[in-house]
């Protein structure tokens, strides 16, 4: 096989709306360029530095054909490994290499993987509201668009301390009452089933806001309403408690968006403590490890529901789609509507049609990148308030 030599690796940060999106571009001597998602919304400049100061000199001049070898080199070259900054940087390069390989092959990426397992992947999006009526309106709007899987949230993840029994002069943060949240969530599921019956698949994200005993209690209370899945009912560092959650409830459990390395997901999968893996593909290092993770999951009956938030590039969204179209145990794809400017910077991104995302048709990942427009919307960073989650006594809690 003729070598395809890496000539340059660049990293771009653009903020077309409220998210800093990180994109890696790999240029080759064959005139083919590839793009990958490296978005770490909370630390974008750290990722850019790692790509341009460390990965670019490491990989320039090497053969882009050898994706597995290059991934292993990026992973171990710094000796310490598997953190979110490094994994996202590696992901950007890894996705770009797969993009290049499938372009040179003249086929969409999912075909390079081995072809499709399904005609289309079901999609879900988010409905929310401060009141049930507001939530119903949000759900109705998604049903009108053809969605039959909807993530529902009543209220949001924290606010000011006013209205809570909190100390004087409360520390700024996203204040959150766990008991109130649990009660409201059970009421929400009851109301949704009363209004929409059983044809609507309801998903819900706890966002790791509970203590283990509360997680067990909530799982038991939600069981009669048959959620499609409950996500992140516990934080990763408390995942051993999922065995006890399992013993008390058959509610399907999803977890993984915060995972960085195989030691975090291996035991949960082989011991069947979760039903859906929710890993963020760039957060675990890109397509190369995602394929390995997917095959491990299939052996133990765990289905795929890759994390797909608004703070990922359309390149990352398309990668999720290629994986989902190909992998037999893919279940569903999260989809967040994009701004018009985001679509101009990243033309060709996947869309939802009547609740489904269909196979991409262009060679490669299939999403373009307009550098000129991207540079017109530069990075803008501010500390994130929503990750400063506080309990009613002011204690910081996992966000």
UniProtKB/Swiss-Prot annotation:
Residues binding D-arabinonate, per UniProt: 207, 257, 278, 307, 334
UniProt keyword Iron present: no
Disulfides per UniProt: none
GO molecular function, one term: lyase activity
InterPro entries assigned: D-mannonate_dehydratase-like, DgoD-like, Enolase-like_C_sf, Enolase-like_N, Enolase_C-like, Mandelate_racemase_C, Mandelate_racemase_N_dom
Protein name: D-galactonate dehydratase family member Ctu_1p00430
The organism of origin for this protein: Cronobacter turicensis (strain DSM 18703 / CCUG 55852 / LMG 23827 / z3032)
Amino-acid positions noted as binding Mg(2+) in the UniProt annotation, renumbered to this chain: 205, 231, 257
Main function: Has no detectable activity with D-mannonate and with a panel of 70 other acid sugars (in vitro), in spite of the conservation of the residues that are expected to be important for catalytic activity and cofactor binding. May have evolved a divergent function.
Assigned protein family: Belongs to the mandelate racemase/muconate lactonizing enzyme family. GalD subfamily.
Organism ancestry: Bacteria, Pseudomonadati, Pseudomonadota, Gammaproteobacteria, Enterobacterales
PANTHER family from the UniProt entry: D-GALACTONATE DEHYDRATASE-RELATED, STARVATION-SENSING PROTEIN RSPA
């Amino acid at each position: 096989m003729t070598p395809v030599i890496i000539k340059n690796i660049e990293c771009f940060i653009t903020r077309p709306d409220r998210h800093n999106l990180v994109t890696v571009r790999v240029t080759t001597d064959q005139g083919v360029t590839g793009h990958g998602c490296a978005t770490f919304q909370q630390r974008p400049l750290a990722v850019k530095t790692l790509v341009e100061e460390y990965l670019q000199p490491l990989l320039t001049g090497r053969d882009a054909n050898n994706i597995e070898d290059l991934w292993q080199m990026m992973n171990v070259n710094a000796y310490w490994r598997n953190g979110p900054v490094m994994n996202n940087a590696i992901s950007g390069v890894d996705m770009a290499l797969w993009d290049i390989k499938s372009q040179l092959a003249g086929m969409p990426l999912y075909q390079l993987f081995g072809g499709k397992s399904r005609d289309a992947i079901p999609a879900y999006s988010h409905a929310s509201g401060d009141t049930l009526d507001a939530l119903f309106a949000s759900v109705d709007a998604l049903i009108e668009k053809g969605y039959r899987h909807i993530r529902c949230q009543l209220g949001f993840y924290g606010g000011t301390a006013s209205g809570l029994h909190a100390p004087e002069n409360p520390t700024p943060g996203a204040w959150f009452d766990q008991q109130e949240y649990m009660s409201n969530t059970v009421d929400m599921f009851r109301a949704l089933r009363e209004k929409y019956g059983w044809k609507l698949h309801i998903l819900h994200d706890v966002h790791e806001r509970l203590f283990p005993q509360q997680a067990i209690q909530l799982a038991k209370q939600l069981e009669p309403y048959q959620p499609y899945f409950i996500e992140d009912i516990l934080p990763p560092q408390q995942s051993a408690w999922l065995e006890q959650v399992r013993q008390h409830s058959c509610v399907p459990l999803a977890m993984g968006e915060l995972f960085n390395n195989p030691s975090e997901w291996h035991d949960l999968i082989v011991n069947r403590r979760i039903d859906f893996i929710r890993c963020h593909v760039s957060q675990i290092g890109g397509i190369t490890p995602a394929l390995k993770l997917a095959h491990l999951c299939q052996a133990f009956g765990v289905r795929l529901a890759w994390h797909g938030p608004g703070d990922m590039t359309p390149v990352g969204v398309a990668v999720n789609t290629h994986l989902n179209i190909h992998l037999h145990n893919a279940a569903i794809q999260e989809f967040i509507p994009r701004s018009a400017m985001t679509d101009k910077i990243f033309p060709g991104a996947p869309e939802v049609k009547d609740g489904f995302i269909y196979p991409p048709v262009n060679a490669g990942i299939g999403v373009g990148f307009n550098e000129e427009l991207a540079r017109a919307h530069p990075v803008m960073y501010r500390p994130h308030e929503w990750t400063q989650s506080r309990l009613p006594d002011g204690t910081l809690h996992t966000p």
